[in-house]
């Protein structure tokens, strides 16, 4: 259609009232890095209707020393694995409260890697059947109704402490912990417009 313009490599930074948007276009993407001047274009856009498709943001779960190198959001780990072909760790511990980590578990086992443990806050009845079957098939230590109490290590993750449903502490040596606390819709631009 003649009234549609596609702006690639463009970030909408502001969504003001009456469908007035500010966007920053980077014209350097795909050009040699030796450009002396970045070519950025600021667009002021006025629309009759705006459709936002911003996606979602994965939530973290709070625990002791969750800022150590080696603690990573599960979706980020999976993106490295499936999009870039990079395996950040061959046997991470996975900590979750939702079903989104099944695809990470499947991707790891399909590549021949075995997580050291799968820790889920939910009780076993609430966890999807295919997740439990995959854990059993590959004999992956499974901790339902449990949580990560904290990570140990000075400059990186060396161990994780798991508080089990019986209130006992299990420690597992690992260098990587993948965490998923579920997802929130990314509504930041939408809230600016109101």
Regions found by a protein language model. Give the residues of each.
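Residues forming the flavin
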Residues: 1-194
């Amino acid at each position: 259609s003649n009234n549609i313009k596609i702006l690639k490599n463009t970030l909408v930074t502001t969504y003001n009232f009456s469908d007035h948007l500010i966007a920053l276009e980077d014209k350097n993407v795909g050009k040699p890095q030796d450009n002396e001047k970045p070519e950025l274009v600021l667009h002021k856009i006025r629309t009759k209707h705006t459709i936002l498709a911003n996606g979602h943001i994965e939530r973290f779960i709070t625990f002791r020393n969750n800022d150590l190198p080696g603690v990573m959001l599960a979706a980020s780990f999976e993106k490295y694995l499936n999009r870039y072909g990079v395996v950040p760790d061959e046997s991470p511990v996975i900590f979750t409260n939702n079903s989104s980590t099944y695809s990470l578990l499947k991707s790891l086992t399909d590549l021949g890697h075995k997580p050291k443990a799968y820790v889920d806050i939910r009780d076993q009845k609430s966890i999807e059947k295919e997740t439990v079957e995959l854990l059993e098939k590959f004999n992956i230590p499974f901790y339902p109704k449990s949580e990560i109490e904290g990570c140990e290590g000075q400059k990186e993750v060396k161990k994780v402490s798991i508080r089990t449903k019986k209130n006992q502490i299990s420690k597992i040596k690992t260098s990587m912990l993948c965490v998923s606390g579920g997802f929130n819709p990314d509504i930041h631009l939408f809230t600016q417009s109101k």
